[in-house]
């Protein structure tokens, strides 16, 4: 074995050791999650008719929270609310709204505050229904900002939290999801900056940015089935991870496990990073790729 090979092996061992130490330190330093703290918590979940948002609603219901859920389809939300009530939610209500309409975003927050008497958690999870809506940015980005601004006063009073559902595609560039990724990068930038501002102002409000990989929602599975070589992780597990991270007021959380390491080492080996990303896709020039989403 050459001296160069020995040096490379030593470097890789040190790199792996550093990654393990960083991961253990992150997990060790996280506060203990207590389920009982969420009993009676006042929670607004957006994008809650299907996928991760639906699973978030069910988990919060099992924990005895008071829920307002929102999405576009009222008939689907009605069924989700009914199940939340069966699972043990103290209260469960829905507001049918289209986040492409600025007045709807304000209305949802106002109605949730009026119905619940305030908010402890604002969980921002919705996405636009089409690539055109994503390019526009009204749904995937601007409505998040608008709802956060509207909810901040009541969250300040309750020492509450904003939970933002983001994506690994908002940390690392990837193909065939450009509108979606662009808005996730924007969310990470805005809410990451807002975290600093709130900390400097000694605010009572915490922000948790949840970085997700590929999740097995119906929406995501339908759009990626022909051209992605990746394992999708369960929506119900990702939802539980999100709730735990928000309840313990972590500034950032990662699910599944590989998203943490991908983010940690994204700039260390750019050539291999790019090859790994491209290898994850089955590209056929004759295909018309559909935007990848995870929510």
Task: Label every PLM stretch briefly.
Residues 42, 47-50:
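Conserved glycine-rich cofactor-binding loop
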Residues 63-80:
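Conserved glycine-rich Rossmann-like NAD(P)H-binding loop of the short-chain dehydrogenase/reductase
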Residues 85-103:
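Rossmann-fold cofactor-recognition segment
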Residues 106, 110, 114, 127-138, ...:
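Conserved mid-core segment of classical short-chain dehydrogenase/reductases
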Residues 148, 183:
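Active-site helix of classical SDR
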Residues 167:
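Residue(s) in the substrate-gating loop at a strand-loop-helix junction
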Residues 196-259:
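SDR active-site lid
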């Amino acid at each position: 074995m050459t001296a160069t090979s020995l040096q490379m092996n030593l470097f890789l061992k040190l790199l792996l050791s550093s990654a393990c130490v960083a991961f253990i330190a992150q997990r060790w330093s996280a506060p203990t999650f207590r389920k009982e703290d969420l009993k009676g918590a006042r929670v607004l979940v957006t994008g809650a008719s299907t996928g991760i948002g639906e699973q978030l609603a069910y988990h919060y219901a099992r924990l005895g929270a008071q829920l307002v859920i929102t999405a576009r389809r009222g008939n689907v939300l009605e069924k989700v609310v009914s199940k939340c009530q069966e699972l043990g939610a103290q209260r469960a209500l829905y507001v049918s709204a289209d986040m492409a309409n600025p007045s709807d975003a304000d209305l949802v927050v106002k109605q949730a505050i009026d119905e619940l008497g305030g908010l402890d958690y604002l969980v921002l999870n919705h996405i636009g229904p089409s690539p055109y809506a994503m390019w526009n940015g009204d749904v995937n980005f601007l409505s998040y900002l608008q709802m956060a601004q509207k909810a901040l006063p009541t969250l300040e009073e309750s020492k509450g939290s904003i939970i933002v559902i983001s994506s690994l595609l908002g940390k690392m560039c990837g193909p065939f999801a450009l509108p979606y990724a662009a808005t996730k990068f924007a969310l990470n930038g805005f809410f990451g900056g807002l975290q600093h501002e709130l900390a400097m102002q000694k605010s009572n409000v915490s922000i948790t940015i949840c970085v997700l990989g590929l999740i097995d929602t119906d929406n995501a599975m339908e759009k990626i089935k022909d051209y992605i070589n990746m394992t999708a992780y369960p929506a119900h597990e990702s939802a539980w991870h999100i709730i735990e991270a928000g309840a313990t007021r972590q500034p950032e959380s990662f699910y599944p496990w590989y998203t943490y390491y991908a983010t940690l080492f994204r700039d260390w080996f750019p050539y291999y990073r790019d090859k790994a990303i491209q290898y994850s896709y089955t590209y056929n020039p004759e295909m018309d790729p559909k935007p990848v989403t995870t929510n």
